[in-house]
């Protein structure tokens, strides 16, 4: 559900950006990577009324986590520059997954062209 909701926000933002461009209204979607927050420690604040949670392993990402203040700077600059996508990771996941996804889409379009001529 989590990944599907993120994909929905991205898709909705793309369509909204396209539809509002004629009115000179920009829409940006933040696609953050690891941010230096206490999200992995949030379990200690979980109310007991929510019941027990599932065990999970906390990833060691402290060395690559971005400072929230730096994220805020990037977001503000991205909005000012009317960027459609605002990323916080210029390497790794972002630079590998996006080209892989585009390649799969192009392959499927090529397949379709072969079917319909």
How would you label these PLM feature ranges?
Residues 85-103:
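Terminal hydrophobic/aromatic helix or amphipathic segment near a protein terminus
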Residues 2, 10:
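Catalytic tyrosine of NAD(P)H-dependent dehydrogenase/reductases that use a Tyr as the general acid/base
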Residues 18, 22-90:
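SDR active-site lid
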Residues 13, 24, 108-111:
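Enrichment for repetitive, rod-forming helical segments
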Residues 5:
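Active-site helix of classical SDR
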Residues 105-117:
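Non-catalytic terminal and boundary segments that flank Rossmann-like NAD(P)-dependent oxidoreductase
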Residues 8, 15-16, 20:
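Conserved alpha-helical elements of the SDR catalytic core
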